[in-house]
């Protein structure tokens, strides 16, 4: 148990408090901006390299993971995507996209950042987009990646991650007001 908690603490999922055990850290703007900016830098470059260096088998895996993700979205939602249900396929799609990069350390960093940002996505329930918008946004990322044009893929990735950041920031900003408006909840001093 201690080893598992130590690993979660090292990855930023829990924090240790002196003489008080562990707790899940609060969501905050600084961490969100740090993770998102790091993702824009690291994953966009990883995607650029994947677009330039990925082979036919990699392209096939990106297409297949996108098809599975699209199918899951269409099966689980009509007006708004249920991220709690579709997140595994979403993660699989992003892993497939970066898997064309031949550098495992870069891919590992991308995966770690994605997992930490998933905590924000799921806790904030921030993405209230319809199925067509979500599918379209990921298609806009996939197409330049598959074209082999590293610069276009890099730009598409930065745009994709920038949109995600702006949505999460807006939700995080309004979260305290939403929490205090719930029945039976008192506003925090």
Which residues fall in each region the model found?
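Conserved amphipathic alpha-helical segments that form helical-bundle/coiled-coil interaction surfaces
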Residues: 30, 47, 52, 56-123, ...
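Alpha-helix N-cap/N′ positions at the starts of helices
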Residues: 19, 42, 64, 133-136
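Short hydrophobic/aromatic segments of transmembrane alpha-helices and their interfaces
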Residues: 5, 14-16, 88-90, 134-135
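Short linear motifs at protein or domain termini
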Residues: 2-52, 165, 169-189
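Solvent-exposed loop and edge beta-strand segments that line ligand/cofactor-binding
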Residues: 126-130
